[in-house]
From Swiss-Prot:
GO cellular component: cytoplasm
Chief localisation class: cytoplasm
Cofactor annotation: Mg(2+)
Source organism of the structure: Leptospira interrogans serogroup Icterohaemorrhagiae serovar Lai (strain 56601)
Name of the protein: Holo-[acyl-carrier-protein] synthase
Function: Transfers the 4'-phosphopantetheine moiety from coenzyme A to a Ser of acyl-carrier-protein.
Catalytic activities: apo-[ACP] + CoA = holo-[ACP] + adenosine 3',5'-bisphosphate + H(+)
The protein's Enzyme Commission number: 2.7.8.7
Location in the cell: Cytoplasm
Sequence intervals crossing the membrane: none
Record: residues binding Mg(2+): 8, 57
Molecular function as annotated in GO: holo-[acyl-carrier-protein] synthase activity; magnesium ion binding
The keyword Membrane is assigned to this record: no
Keywords: Cytoplasm, Fatty acid biosynthesis, Fatty acid metabolism, Lipid biosynthesis, Lipid metabolism, Magnesium, Metal-binding, Transferase
Length: 126
């Protein structure tokens, strides 16, 4: 079995600053409609947005797209219950790259603290 791991950590204040500066433009550029809806229904959406941002960055690091390949972050979606197992759903170029590289599955771990959010993505193939 071959695995590829990506991780990311972000200060929640960075995402808060981006949201305050760019508003909906930032949200619509980075998050899918379902992710925006999920996060907006949380008491404090910032840690949830930050965590999802980390998942997207961690996936990009794990997939190693190569030079001059830009992946649309909205095509990397995180689904799952608040305290349950999370699932990564890929679309477009992200899904195509995942399949082309022969990956058969992935695991996601996401965590939030007061000031930071972090995520690890593990891609694997038999």
């Amino acid at each position: 079995m071959k695995i590829s791991v990506g991780n990311d950590i972000v200060e929640n204040s960075r995402i808060r600053d981006l949201l305050e500066k760019h508003g909906d433009r930032f949200l619509k550029r980075v998050f899918s409609e379902s992710e925006r809806e999920y996060c907006s229904n949380r008491k404090d959406p910032i840690p949830h947005l930050s965590g999802r941002f980390c998942v997207k960055e961690a996936f990009i690091k794990a997939i190693e797209p190569g030079d001059h390949v830009i992946l649309d972050m909205r095509e990397i979606e995180l689904f799952g219950k608040e305290f349950g197992k999370k699932e990564l759903v890929l679309h477009g170029k992200s899904k195509e790259l995942f399949l082309t590289k022969g990956y058969s599955g992935c695991s996601v771990s996401i965590s939030h603290a007061e000031n930071y959010s972090t995520a690890v993505v593990v891609l694997y193939k038999e």
